[in-house]
């Protein structure tokens, strides 16, 4: 039996086992505090331009297991994935595994978990704790892009206030696509020298001095929610360095300490919700232009902010617009990013057929380079368990982060079964 057949058999066996456990636990739901749920999804994308090759082809089983005992909850979630295009992504992945305990006015959560800060939608201003999986760039669900971290979180709260203290002992950075077979690779193509990705020794070591730490103070008041936050962290998106050696060039990621303090605010006004978010980044590092050569890296302070408005319109329409901008203080010409970098997002959706069909579009528009990424989606709920989706990812522009992928526009289809 081939390796592919072995993986397929294990995949099917795991799925059938989860269904059996789900059925057995469902029969004892009244007597048991165990909970099992999850989903199976399959996603396939084809480039809309020649050579019309596959951009993605993966099938996944997500399992989520919870156990409640008194004021505590144990939660574990995992993925088992078969990726036909990126063989290295095939296998088992522990997603979350944490212990959560809550008392009347305090609590804690210890373990591998997702940490979500701020009110921005698909844009990172103060949401800098959890890194991002950019293996397929932004052409996947944002919930799959955000990565969990090993964190210790302590909470103190009442009806109007919540204080969160956070420590992340182990470093995890962005997961970047560096495989030449990956159409979303961040490495340049058609280079004179062969590129070799080497991240050995790049990540911060497991030392007490390298711990990330911070806190967030949230207020829920009549007519307005807002928070203040601060974090001593690392740049999760690494700076890329190139060093030539003989007949090849070594490409390595570099990580540097940085920090921020900022906050967010959200205020409902009838059918509208106004949102804002801002951060002052300290010692943030940036990639340099190629002509900068081996110039020594240094940190810069930046001001990053976002304003947004959501309209929950009649007849199940929803429109969400955001404008964000980052300004680098004491700018120097070797920095590859513009002094003022701005991004506009627009999210429009409409539900039809008794809310079983949803048509939506989410667009990022790079105002500096006039590039864009627009995801059109049509999603139909066949029943309470099965959802079918088709869509088109449209990239455009000649420069910037979206222009890099202007030939990666794709047609995609997805099926999802929830259990």
Label each region the model flagged.
Residues 28-48, 72, 76, 359:
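Transmembrane beta-strand segments of Gram-negative outer membrane beta-barrel proteins
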Residues 34, 71-76, 106-108, 160-163, ...:
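Repeated loop/turn-to-beta-strand initiation elements of outer-membrane beta-barrel proteins
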Residues 38-40, 76, 110, 154, ...:
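Membrane-embedded beta-strand positions of outer-membrane beta-barrel proteins
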Residues 42-48, 69-71, 80-84, 103-105, ...:
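Transmembrane beta-strands of outer-membrane beta-barrel pores
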Residues 53-59, 90-95, 104, 146-150, ...:
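Residues that define the transmembrane beta-barrel architecture of outer-membrane proteins
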Residues 66-184, 218, 222, 397:
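Outer membrane beta-barrel
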Residues 348, 407-419:
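Outer-membrane beta-barrel "beta-signal"
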């Amino acid at each position: 039996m081939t390796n592919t057949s072995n993986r397929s058999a294990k995949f099917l066996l795991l799925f059938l086992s989860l269904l059996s456990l789900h059925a057995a636990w469902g029969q004892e739901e009244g007597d048991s505090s165990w909970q099992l749920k999850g989903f199976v999804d399959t996603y396939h994308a084809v480039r809309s331009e020649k050579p019309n090759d596959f951009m993605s082809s993966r099938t996944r089983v997500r399992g989520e297991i919870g156990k409640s005992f008194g004021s505590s909850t144990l939660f574990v979630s995992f993925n088992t994935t078969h990726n036909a295009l990126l063989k290295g992504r095939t296998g088992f992945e522990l997603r979350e595994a944490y212990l959560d305990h809550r008392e009347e006015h305090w609590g804690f959560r210890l373990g591998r978990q997702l940490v979500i800060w701020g009110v921005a939608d698909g844009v990172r201003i103060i949401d800098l704790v959890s890194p991002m999986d950019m293996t397929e760039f932004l052409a996947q669900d944002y919930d799959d892009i955000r990565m969990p971290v090993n964190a210790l979180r302590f909470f103190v709260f009442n009806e109007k206030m919540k204080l969160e203290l956070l420590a992340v002992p182990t470093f995890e950075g962005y997961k970047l696509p560096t495989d030449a077979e990956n159409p979303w690779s961040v490495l340049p193509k058609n280079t004179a020298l062969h590129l070799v990705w080497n991240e050995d020794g790049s990540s911060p070591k497991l030392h007490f001095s390298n711990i990330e730490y911070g806190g967030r103070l949230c207020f829920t008041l009549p007519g307005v929610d807002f928070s203040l936050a601060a974090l001593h962290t690392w740049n999760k998106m690494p700076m890329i360095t190139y060093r030539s050696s003989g007949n090849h060039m070594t490409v390595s990621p570099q990580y540097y300490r940085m920090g921020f303090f900022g906050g967010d605010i959200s205020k409902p006004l009838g059918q509208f919700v106004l949102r804002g978010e801002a951060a002052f980044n300290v010692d943030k590092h940036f990639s340099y232009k190629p002509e900068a050569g081996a110039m020594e890296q240094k940190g810069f302070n930046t001001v990053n902010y976002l304003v947004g408005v959501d309209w929950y319109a009649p007849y199940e329409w929803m429109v969400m617009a955001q404008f964000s901008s980052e300004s680098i203080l004491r700018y120097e010409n070797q920095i590859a990013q513009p002094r003022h970098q701005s991004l506009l997002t627009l999210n429009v959706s409409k539900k039809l057929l008794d809310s079983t069909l949803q048509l939506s579009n989410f667009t990022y528009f790079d105002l500096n380079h006039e590039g864009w990424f627009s995801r059109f989606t049509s999603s139909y709920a066949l029943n309470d368990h099965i959802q079918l989706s088709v869509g088109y990812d449209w990239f455009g522009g000649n420069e910037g982060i979206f222009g890099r992928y202007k030939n990666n526009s794709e047609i995609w289809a997805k099926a999802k079964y929830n259990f």
